[in-house]
From Swiss-Prot:
Pfam families: ZinT, ZnuA
SUPFAM superfamilies xref list: Helical backbone' metal receptor, Lipocalins
Biased amino acid composition, Basic and acidic residues: 125-136
Upper lineage: Bacteria, Bacillati, Bacillota, Bacilli, Lactobacillales
Gene: adcA
Region (Disordered) location: 116-136
Highest taxon in the source lineage: Bacteria
Membrane topology: Lipid-anchor
Residues with lipid group (S-diacylglycerol cysteine): 19
GO terms, molecular function: zinc ion binding
Secreted is among the record's keywords: no
Keywords: Cell membrane, Competence, Ion transport, Lipoprotein, Membrane, Palmitate, Signal, Transport, Zinc, Zinc transport
Name the record gives this protein: Zinc-binding lipoprotein AdcA
Organism listed in the record: Streptococcus pneumoniae (strain ATCC BAA-255 / R6)
Amino acid sequence: MKKISLLLASLCALFLVACSNQKQADGKLNIVTTFYPVYEFTKQVAGDTANVELLIGAGTEPHEYEPSAKAVAKIQDADTFVYENENMETWVPKLLDTLDKKKVKTIKATGDMLLLPGGEEEEGDHDHGEEGHHHEFDPHVWLSPVRAIKLVEHIRDSLSADYPDKKETFEKNAAAYIEKLQSLDKAYAEGLSQAKQKSFVTQHAAFNYLALDYGLKQVAISGLSPDAEPSAARLAELTEYVKKNKIAYIYFEENASQALANTLSKEAGVKTDVLNPLESLTEEDTKAGENYISVMEKNLKALKQTTDQEGPAIEPEKAEDTKTVQNGYFEDAAVKDRTLSDYAGNWQSVYPFLEDGTFDQVFDYKAKLTGKMTQAEYKAYYTKGYQTDVTKINITDNTMEFVQGGQSKKYTYKYVGKKILTYKKGNRGVRFLFEATDADAGQFKYVQFSDHNIAPVKAEHFHIFFGGTSQETLFEEMDNWPTYYPDNLSGQEIAQEMLAH
């Protein structure tokens, strides 16, 4: 009996050793991913070269997730850790500080992709109570097929760089999957290009990139949860809003309860449908063979319930106030004198980043968001605006140093007043005027700052005008406004800041 027990113990030990050495035995990479889209895209690229594990399963809200000690240990034991973006997995930056970078390779799936500003999302959804949740920047790029392709490409390139011996396999797998995503993109483009109604109403404000890339407009509403009926007061507001805007469908992230669907139908005359944000797949979905592409196809079918019907543009419940000081709307009495210390610091021109293509994503967003100009037209407009040969400006409380063509020129300045200018669009701006006390200041004799502020405050960036003739001559310059940001920011960081404001 003792011999049998010893044999069993030995076999168990061998089994445990074999399990712990599985990576070495099968030669596969051990990759840990955060939530479903990241898992799916990574798995498609890695194929048989890796054991790809999903950290955040169905029933757990990715926005709210905090890794357990066991989950952290799992990541620390991986070859590669893949996440989407710190604006989605907000816990990742702290985790990265603890990782052994030599042992665990990290991939941020969004790479250098710029994100749109975030905002307050749905109230009462995801069990968030009354406040909803907030992203500084909107991370939901995977819900646009054309951007999903970019995520897959970045995962492919990152894995290939980290494991060059497997590059050929990664590229082959990615190409096959990207072909499917391109078909999905084509289906969305063709299915939505002739939309009769371009606005859709959703309880989960996750579809902004999808809307932007396919010519639609997402209108998010608050105070609705798929499994709870709204209060009588909220229902009355919704009823008025739905009827005023002739809304046919409200989209939820999961099937609304029958009670809620009946209430909305009876009281507001609106139907409900599902737009799945694909943050997870349920066990039932997985067993049914659902995946990213099949769910996105269902999302398209659901969207067409709205876009195939004629209807007026749907306005948000709460209109955004665009007449702000930053946009050029203010009272004269609010304009106050400022000192050079508001601009103190070391600044870099943004013009080189326009030239090297860093800002191309910014111009693409502007074209899609406004519809006023194409991406190429925006780039031409900003090329004229940003153009300058002054690469750096270093400012103290009373001096400015201009770095031009490798030469440094430094002068002392005094404040000489302010000027309110009215623009063609009807909005206004304030220029704060400075004059060099040095007789040899030349083209830097007269300087004007415009930073979208009208009273003393530390500038985050500024547009500058300078010349050697007079302040009055500079007032006439409206097309060239060299722009400067702190010199410790990368071009990528500046581009993201531009989208945030």
